[in-house]
Swiss-Prot record:
Domain of life: Eukaryota
Recorded phenotype for the gene knockout or disruption: No visible phenotype under normal growth condition, but compromised pathogen-induced glycerol-3-phosphate-(G3P) and azelaic acid- (AA) dependent systemic acquired resistance (SAR).
GO cellular component, one term: endoplasmic reticulum
Protein's job: Putative lipid transfer protein required for systemic acquired resistance (SAR) long distance signaling. May interact with a lipid-derived molecule to promote long distance signaling associated with SAR. Together with AZI1, required for glycerol-3-phosphate- (G3P) and azelaic acid- (AA) induced systemic acquired resistance (SAR). Component of plant systemic immunity involved in priming defenses in a AA-dependent manner, by modulating production and/or translocation of a mobile signal(s) during SAR. Is able to bind with high affinity monoacylated phospholipids, mainly lysophosphatidylcholines.
Co-factor binding details: Binds 1 zinc ion per subunit.
Matching PANTHER family: LIPID BINDING PROTEIN-RELATED, LIPID-TRANSFER PROTEIN DIR1-RELATED
Protein name in UniProt: Putative lipid-transfer protein DIR1
Amino acid sequence: MASKKAAMVMMAMIVIMAMLVDTSVAIDLCGMSQDELNECKPAVSKENPTSPSQPCCTALQHADFACLCGYKNSPWLGSFGVDPELASALPKQCGLANAPTC
């Protein structure tokens, strides 16, 4: 249990560092690249969310939903301005038939 928590904290730190440093650092989280995650950010933002873009919906087609659902209750989402409820609704908004319920 402790090692799983430590791994999640480490992954969150990597994501934070990648978002803070505007470089060509390649990051892959739950089958989505940093660029793909950024495509979806406007649709899951706490302030002024938008409808998901076509590039966001395309990226979600190959995402690992079980992995993404694992972050739903993560306190790190709030620090990125991500609303977990909006994020959970995103696959349905994109019309993805294989979208799980987190």
